[in-house]
Every structure is written in C-alpha cells, then in structure tokens.
C-alpha cells in the first residue's frame, strides 16, 4: 500500500492568500480542506504580512501537511503590486519552511498544464478540473481553487522534484 502524503498548496497574495490541502497516496487523491486568508487593508504592510503569517502557521498546525507547493511569482507592469505580491510570497515560503516542510515552487503555466493539460487555460477550466479530480472539494474563492491546483500539480511532480532535490543536495 502506498504511503499517504499530505500536501498544502499556497497561492500567495497580500489581499487574499488561497490555501488547499490534499492527501495523495499512489494514484488516489483526497480533498482535505481549503480556504482563503485575508489581510486587513486598513493596516500597514508589516501588520498585514503578520496576519498572513499567523494564518498560515495556524493552518499548518491544524492540518499537518508534509510538503508545500507555492506559486512562483510573476512580474507585471505595476512594480508596486509585484513587490507586494513578492512580500506575500515570502510569507508563503517562510511559514512552511519554518515548520520544516520541503517547499516546492511552480510557475502558473506548469500548474495549468498539470491540471488541465494546457499551459494557458483560464480560471474556469482550472476550477472545473479541480472539482473533477477532487469531487468533494469545497472552496470559497478562486484563490483557494488555485491553491488546490498547486497541490494537485505537486502530487504529479513530487517524485521527480524530490529526486531532483536529492541530486542537488
């Protein structure tokens, strides 16, 4: 019988950070939980980052994942927005790393290709395939659905990723 691995996917954002937890065993996938963390826009940046960090650490303690998958940041024309996203992403990398989880990063196109078969699909296609692959999945936002897609992507790439990590060590 295959070992069950619990994976958390994290879709970082300063306003909304999606998270999704799945169990993966052999070729079996099971939805565990998903949700969205929000930070209070009335607070300063440091306080908002603390809110996200506390929320993520609480989720990590509650669901006890063994591996984490985080979306790789993209750069857009708005430098300020890109910087804020990068800071939220740092929290998404830090929280599981401090919990001693291996953290893997995936570009949005790789996630889409893993979940829907093409690298340039839209949000609706991703949400539909998340529901197909995880029929019991419930998510409160597109950020949570994207986080589940990250966890699914990692479940398909984890053997190669862990092998690559051992080679690089």
Curated annotation (Swiss-Prot):
Sorted UniProt keywords: Cytoplasm, DNA damage, DNA recombination, DNA repair, DNA-binding, Endonuclease, Hydrolase, Magnesium, Metal-binding, Nuclease
Compartments reported by the entry: Cytoplasm
Residues holding Mg(2+) 1: 11, 143
Catalysed reactions, semicolon-separated: Endonucleolytic cleavage at a junction such as a reciprocal single-stranded crossover between two homologous DNA duplexes (Holliday junction)
GO cellular component terms, semicolon-separated: cytoplasm; Holliday junction resolvase complex
Species the sequence originates in: Bartonella henselae (strain ATCC 49882 / DSM 28221 / CCUG 30454 / Houston 1) (Rochalimaea henselae)
GO biological process terms on file: DNA recombination; DNA repair
Record-given protein name: Crossover junction endodeoxyribonuclease RuvC
Binding site for Mg(2+) 2: 71
Keyword Glycoprotein: no
EC number(s) on file: 3.1.21.10
Annotated active site: 11, 71, 143
Family the entry assigns: Belongs to the RuvC family.
GO molecular function, one term: DNA binding
UniProt xrefs under CDD domains: RuvC (cd16962)
Cofactors named for this entry: Mg(2+)
Assembly mode: Homodimer which binds Holliday junction (HJ) DNA. The HJ becomes 2-fold symmetrical on binding to RuvC with unstacked arms; it has a different conformation from HJ DNA in complex with RuvA. In the full resolvosome a probable DNA-RuvA(4)-RuvB(12)-RuvC(2) complex forms which resolves the HJ.
Function (record text): The RuvA-RuvB-RuvC complex processes Holliday junction (HJ) DNA during genetic recombination and DNA repair. Endonuclease that resolves HJ intermediates. Cleaves cruciform DNA by making single-stranded nicks across the HJ at symmetrical positions within the homologous arms, yielding a 5'-phosphate and a 3'-hydroxyl group; requires a central core of homology in the junction. The consensus cleavage sequence is 5'-(A/T)TT(C/G)-3'. Cleavage occurs on the 3'-side of the TT dinucleotide at the point of strand exchange.
Coiled coil region boundaries: none
Cofactor binding: number and manner: Binds 2 Mg(2+) ion per subunit.
Class of the enzyme per the UniProt entry, highest EC level: hydrolase
